[in-house]
């Protein structure tokens, strides 16, 4: 007999997707599905980039709906309270929570499996990178590089604009001599992409122990051995300098990092930063210039910005 699960639906803005997902992964969540109107809009404009596309997502209107799945246990009510309180605090960090409403439904185990997995299909991100969930079959073309990811535990699955732009930038700048640092690695998707692009050495760092565990497991699924994942912050656990540093976080954290980035970046090295909403782009750009960076690229998708700067 199927066991009961809880489905928690959060109605929010596209801007808050990454932040809300982070909140959910601070609870004992077993799976997350994201329905984002910005993703649907992008997919409609770029139909040739998608090998599969769930037509049910076309029903998504403005903003985003994030669905999370939990076992029916005594800790569930505490998780819901934490989610609601954390979403209410997003505005304190300059993040638009949208409606910020939380709804709870009971579903059986079979429904959870179907509801969660149907949103994740093989997705072409850049010119070469294809992100594939573990349970899907996909035969890459000769020029494609496939990333096997487990979205159930992931903090980044490749579908969000910020992740997509960072991967596209890595495609342009990574070469076989490059050493790459991924700050706030989450699921490890950017670190794995850099390794697949034949970087000499890749280092991923995250303050969240759950993210570190997820990244290490995703690395195993991809059979890459030139990656190291560390638990901690940039200043305390990283040694040496990189040719490329990538950080897909939020503008406030990036601005805090910028003065220290040049201590870890080689001369003529590149700093790729995203997780920046349009309204904060100039703030980050000015901070980069103040710290002796040259702005090479400013790219945007939806409401998000990705900046490539050179030291």
Swiss-Prot record:
Binding positions for S-adenosyl-L-methionine per the UniProt entry: 163, 184, 206, 248
Entry keywords, A to Z: Cytoplasm, Methyltransferase, S-adenosyl-L-methionine, Stress response, Transferase
Coiled coil region boundaries: none
Cellular localisation: Cytoplasm
UniProt-listed Pfam families: PrmA
GO molecular function, one term: protein-lysine N-methyltransferase activity
Any one GO biological process: methylation
Catalytic activity: L-lysyl-[protein] + 3 S-adenosyl-L-methionine = N(6),N(6),N(6)-trimethyl-L-lysyl-[protein] + 3 S-adenosyl-L-homocysteine + 3 H(+)
Induction pattern: By heat shock.
Family the UniProt entry places it in: Belongs to the methyltransferase superfamily. PrmA family.
Protein name as catalogued: Ribosomal protein L11 methyltransferase
Gene source species: Clostridium acetobutylicum (strain ATCC 824 / DSM 792 / JCM 1419 / IAM 19013 / LMG 5710 / NBRC 13948 / NRRL B-527 / VKM B-1787 / 2291 / W)
């Amino acid at each position: 007999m199927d066991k009961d699960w809880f489905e928690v639906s959060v109605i929010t803005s596209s801007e808050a997707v990454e932040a809300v997902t982070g909140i959910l992964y601070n609870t004992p969540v077993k799976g997350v599905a994201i329905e984002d109107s910005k993703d649907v809009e992008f997919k409609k404009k770029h139909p040739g980039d998608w090998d599969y596309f769930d037509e049910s997502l076309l029903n998504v209107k403005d903003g985003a709906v994030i669905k999370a799945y939990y076992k029916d246990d005594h800790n569930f009510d505490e998780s819901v309270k934490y989610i609601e309180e954390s979403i209410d605090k997003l505005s304190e960090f300059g993040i638009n929570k949208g409606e910020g409403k939380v709804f709870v439904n009971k579903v059986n185990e079979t429904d959870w499996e179907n509801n969660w997995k149907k949103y994740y299909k093989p997705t072409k991100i850049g010119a070469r990178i294809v992100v594939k969930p573990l349970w899907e079959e996909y035969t890459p073309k000769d020029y494609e590089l496939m990333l096997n990811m487990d979205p159930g535990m992931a903090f980044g699955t490749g579908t969000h604009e910020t992740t997509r732009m960072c991967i596209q930038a890595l495609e342009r700048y990574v070469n076989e001599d490059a050493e790459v640092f991924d700050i706030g690695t989450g699921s490890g998707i950017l670190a794995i992409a850099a390794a697949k692009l034949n970087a000499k050495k890749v280092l991923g760092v995250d303050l969240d122990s759950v993210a570190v565990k997820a990244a290490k497991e995703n690395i195993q699924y991809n059979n890459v051995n030139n990656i190291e994942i560390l638990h901690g912050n940039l200043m305390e656990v990283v040694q040496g300098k990189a040719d490329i540093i990538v950080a897909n976080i939020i503008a406030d954290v990036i601005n805090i990092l910028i003065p220290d980035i040049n201590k870890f970046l080689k001369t003529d090295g590149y700093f790729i930063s995203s997780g920046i909403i349009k309204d904060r782009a100039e703030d980050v750009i000015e901070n980069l210039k103040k710290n002796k960076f040259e702005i090479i690229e400013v790219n945007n998708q939806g409401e998000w910005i990705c900046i490539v700067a050179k030291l």
